[in-house]
Amino acid sequence: MSQRMQQGQPMIILGEDSQRTQGKDAQTMNITAGKAVAESVRTTLGPKGMDKMLVDSGGSVVVTNDGVTILKEMDIDHPAANMIVEVSETQEDEVGDGTTTAVVIAGELLDEAEELIDQDIHPTTLAQGYRSAAEKAKEILEQNAIDVSPDDRETLVKIASTAMTGKGAENAKDTLADLLVDAVLAVRDDEGVDTDNISVEKVVGGAIDNSELIEGVIVDKERVS
């Protein structure tokens, strides 16, 4: 038995067609893969952003300009590219919006890093610089952040409405924004908001404008004829 197996380290067997890259070639391939992912959603960003039509192997069609939706529908195998996808997923889970912006910024950082590497700046130095820049950016954001009171309903509705822009629910965002704010305030306590206490149930029939907030329990029963 090999020493690596004795130490509990996994042994990975690669296929015959596998290729191994290292050094500058590996850096270039990883950066290129990450930039390609960012480029795929770049044109969906902003007020003039365009929708993407995605067709899967089964023929299903999805039309959206939502970054995380687009990236989830794409078949991505490259490890570095998948790290960029994880950026969008983390942004979606933590904030619920800004996924495309996060991916585009990551792509720009990779682009700048590539230029600096070409100038023989060591990747470790770049990583340290990016960490310092992230701390400074966080500091500036905290200085410019505005506290929003739970009683400031107008601002809360605007925030919810903005988060739906460019998504499937955009046509009904005025109605849904009010519902969302009501739902969040209903489960708010001194420790914050536990979104697990909010359940979204879909019912066949009707329009999205028929959505309503039920502060209680829903029992799915067929109508008696």
What kind of region is each of these model predictions?
Residues S2-Q6, P10-S18, A26-T32, T43-D93, ...:
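Long, low-complexity regulatory segments enriched in Ser/Thr/Pro/Gly and acidic residues
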Residues T21-T28, I117, I121-T124, A163-N171:
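Generic amphipathic alpha-helical segments used as scaffolds and interaction surfaces in large
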Residues K138-S225:
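Long, structured protein-protein interaction/assembly regions in large complexes
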Residues K35:
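Structured ligand/cofactor/substrate-binding pocket environments in proteins
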